[in-house]
Amino acid sequence: MYELHVKDFSSDPHCGISDKHRGKFLAFTEEGTTLNGDGIHATGFDYLKSLGISHVHLLPVFDFGSVPEDDAEAFNWGYDPVQYNVPEGSYATDPFHGEVRIREMKEMVQALHKAGIGVIMDVVYNHTYNLDSPLQKTVPYYYYREWEDGTISNGSDCGNETASEREMFRRFMVHSVCYWAKEYHIDGFRFDLMALHDTETMNAIRTALNRMPRGEEILVYGEPWKAAASAMQEGYFPSDKQNIGRLMDGISMFCDDTRDSIKGSVFIAAEGGYVNGKERLSAGILSATDGWMDGKGAYEPRNASQLIPYVSAHDNYTLWDKLKLSDPKRKEDAEPDFDKMDERTLSMNRLAAGIVMTCKGMPFFQAGEEFARTKHGEGNSFKSSWQLNKIDWTRALEQEELVDYYRGLLALRRKFQAYGTCEPDCKKTFFRENQIPPVALKAMLTP
């Protein structure tokens, strides 16, 4: 799964995509685009096709309230939902006529499907942009969680936390997801802060999707954590790590144990992981490749498909920036040079990718990880400029060898089905800790 923001994809002036489609849904429909129009180095849609990914995971594409829809310079990740069942207007060539955004989003999905690439939506049902919402106007305070003193719960750290355990909001969530799946042919849903949704609601969503034609193929996964304390009603269970056993098959969650074992804590910039030389974490790496089925992590999955191995996402630092910041050989008072392409950091990047791509389950990575994407040390770029967030297509050319390494890993997974095997009783595909020492593991995953 390749995580991508619609505007990031085509904002770079060097991308070769037409000006009228830059930052828009229709950028995904342009074929034959090349870097600076050189006719050689593929960008955009053709680049995606060449990479070998199975799915594009799009950051929020429903209507959100944090940017003026007619301001081409405005930028936000989009985790500010207003109208859950309407495409975002700032990604349409004409935000003032509703039919345009609907048609153009469908054209984007259709183009990706023709290329054999599935489309996953990032959905944010855990809060609304503000309290002046259609939900609040329908039945005041019914759709929101409250503390005993009457204040609105803020488990999202964005305010206005919704109450999935209430029957009508649960029903709304189920119908909304099914609407996107049926009307827009969406292939999967990533639930933001999934731990703010109760397990009963998540299972209801999975059940409803399974009843649709080929619905069992639709992916459902999310973040098994919340941002702050939640006033979820007593007697319901949050969809977090501790309750993974209460979730149906076909509902997965991001595995931060894998992430942190590989590169270190996302909350401490200078803390490294296995790829930085912390060999004491090698046991965690071996557990990760087997989907943590050995019970050594914080999760107790029934099978490896319940966990998503990853090392980078839109949150926190890009993988490249994190590796630069956590390099143990960097002097504490020295500023890292994020544009310097040194072999040491490139090796760590390759090793991190090699581990993720040889884990059981369905790996996930942030767009640009494959060419050392940098945001120059910005760890939370949700409302930074598009210039900082854009996909730098020149960098993709400069790091062509790293891109080819990722292509090779993706081809390896397609060729050997054992990498995706998730059955709990499946023979271990890789190796045991007492058979291969950490240094040998590192050598096996390094070109």
Region spans (language model):
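Conserved alpha/beta catalytic core and glycan-binding cleft of carbohydrate-active enzymes
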Residues: 206-212, 216-372, 380-382, 417-420, ...
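Catalytic cores of secreted or luminal carbohydrate-active enzymes
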Residues: 397-429
